[in-house]
């Protein structure tokens, strides 16, 4: 393969089709050998290591991705790297920091729904039920069929003693 982008895309292909003979990380790592700052490969490796429950390694890749993607602008076009980093932090039990990074992820349109859903769940964890409802509603504004956001909303409403029947009966 001639370019970093080709290696990255080959890794994405292997990951999508779950080829049992090849792991996608070999492509992403080769891309990073050629360009240590290749942001898509850094994010892909963070996701790969997260999926293997190697959270420390995933965290390192995500931090490198954030460092490179935010060189010129903290408000990045895609919130994916912030979202992935927040997931890793949450898995490591760093809930406050995860919350902050989910908030950063929610600034990008591609990540609002999923980031607000995770924020609502962390609100519930912190017994901040009114905030959880607000954040779940925002997530639902970006995807009415989001089952996890609906569940978070119902849990928060029940915790406040509110009737959650209308959300349960929505299609």
Where are these regions (language model features)?
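Residue-level recognition of tetratricopeptide repeat
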Residues: 12-13, 47, 87, 121, ...
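Residue-level detector of the short coil/turn that links helix A to helix B
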Residues: 18-19, 53, 93, 127, ...
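Single-residue signature of alpha-solenoid repeat helices
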Residues: 24, 58, 98, 132, ...
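Structural marker of alpha-solenoid helical repeat scaffolds
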Residues: 34, 68-72, 108, 142
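TPR alpha-solenoid repeat register
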Residues: 41, 74-75, 81, 115, ...
């Amino acid at each position: 393969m001639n370019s970093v982008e080709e290696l990255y895309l080959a890794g994405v292909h292997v990951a999508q089709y779950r080829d049992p003979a090849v792991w996608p990380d070999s492509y992403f790592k080769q891309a990073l050998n050629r360009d240590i700052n290749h942001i898509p490969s850094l994010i892909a490796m963070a996701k790969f290591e997260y999926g293997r429950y190697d959270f420390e390694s995933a965290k390192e890749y995500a931090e490198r991705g954030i460092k490179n993607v935010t060189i010129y602008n903290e408000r990045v076009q895609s919130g994916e790297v912030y979202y992935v980093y927040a997931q890793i932090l949450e898995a490591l039990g760093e809930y406050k920091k995860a919350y902050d990074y989910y908030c950063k992820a929610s600034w990008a349109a591609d990540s609002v729904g999923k980031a607000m859903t995770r924020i609502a769940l962390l609100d519930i964890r912190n017994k901040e039920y009114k905030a959880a409802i607000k954040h779940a509603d925002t997530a639902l504004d970006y995807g009415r069929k989001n089952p996890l956001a609906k569940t978070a909303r119902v849990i928060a409403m029940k915790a406040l003693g509110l009737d959650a029947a209308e959300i349960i009966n929505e299609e």
